């Protein structure tokens, strides 16, 4: 399946929650009514979604949130299932460790899509080496930095300014002046994605 390139607000309305696909400069909450699905008539009143439908919807929501397509998402699940511990929590930890997501969490990109583009365009380094693979898995202690020739890009400067106003997650440490940061640790489950019910995804793939 190709990556969705249409209106971002429509995806958040479809999932009934903000997927953080738009910059915080223009809150998607101002444009999307999350209790109404896209379309002329919106959500059908009184309609009950099946268990399978709920599970599928949750998977779609997380895929769209992190910008991951089905084949790759399935691989993440299989890896999460092989690891010790809770499969659902492992899945989210893998998604959070993607380089594009870490770049977003550090505030170098105002959205995950923008962060993915920065990585793909070789604007970022990991431990001093250029990495242009958005799915690259960042490890605790890795240093992420904007390449010197990209530091003055307006979108990066503006994204960092916005991130400093909003606040950074506890698991990253940023030096905005140098446009670099450290991925201190993979976050615990209770530190992120509070509106994600990963157990539904586990149930779906366990069918």
Swiss-Prot record:
InterPro entries: Ribosomal_uS4 (IPR022801), Ribosomal_uS4_bac-type (IPR005709), Ribosomal_uS4_CS (IPR018079), Ribosomal_uS4_N (IPR001912), S4_RNA-bd (IPR002942), S4_RNA-bd_sf (IPR036986). Residues 31-53 are annotated as: Disordered. GO terms for cellular component: small ribosomal subunit. SUPFAM superfamilies: Alpha-L RNA-binding motif. One of its GO terms (molecular function) is structural constituent of ribosome. Residues 97-160 form the S4 RNA-binding domain. It holds the Pfam family S4. GO terms for biological process: ribosomal small subunit biogenesis; translation. CDD domains: S4. Keywords: Ribonucleoprotein, Ribosomal protein, RNA-binding, rRNA-binding. It comes from the Bacteria. NCBIfam families: PRK05327.1, rpsD_bact. HAMAP family: Ribosomal_uS4_B. Part of the 30S ribosomal subunit. Contacts protein S5. The interaction surface between S4 and S5 is involved in control of translational fidelity. PANTHER family: 30S 40S RIBOSOMAL PROTEIN (PTHR11831), SMALL RIBOSOMAL SUBUNIT PROTEIN US4M (PTHR11831:SF4). One of the primary rRNA binding proteins, it binds directly to 16S rRNA where it nucleates assembly of the body of the 30S subunit. With S5 and S12 plays an important role in translational accuracy. Belongs to the universal ribosomal protein uS4 family. This is Small ribosomal subunit protein uS4. It comes from Albidiferax ferrireducens (strain ATCC BAA-621 / DSM 15236 / T118) (Rhodoferax ferrireducens). The lineage of its organism: Bacteria, Pseudomonadati, Pseudomonadota, Betaproteobacteria, Burkholderiales. The gene is rpsD.
């Amino acid at each position: 399946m190709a990556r969705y390139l249409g209106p971002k607000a429509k995806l958040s309305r479809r999932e009934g929650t903000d997927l953080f696909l738009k910059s915080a400069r223009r809150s998607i909450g101002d444009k999307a009514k999350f209790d109404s699905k896209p379309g002329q008539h919106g959500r059908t009143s009184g309609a009950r979604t099946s268990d399978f439908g709920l599970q599928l919807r949750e998977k779609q929501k997380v895929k769209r949130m992190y910008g991951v397509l089905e084949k790759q998402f399935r691989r993440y699940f299989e890896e999460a299932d092989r690891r010790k511990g809770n499969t659902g929590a492992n899945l989210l930890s893998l998604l959070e460790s993607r380089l594009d997501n870490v770049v977003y969490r550090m505030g170098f990109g105002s959205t995950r899509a923008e962060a993915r583009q920065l990585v793909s365009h070789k604007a970022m380094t990991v431990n001093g080496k250029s990495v242009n693979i958005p799915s690259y898995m960042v490890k605790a202690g890795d240093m992420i930095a904007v390449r010197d020739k990209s530091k003055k890009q307006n979108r990066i400067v503006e994204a960092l300014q916005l991130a400093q106003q909003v606040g950074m997650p506890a698991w990253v440490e940023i030096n905005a002046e140098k446009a670099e940061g450290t991925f201190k640790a993979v976050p615990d489950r209770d530190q992120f994605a509070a509106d994600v019910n990963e157990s539904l995804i586990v149930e779906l793939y366990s069918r």
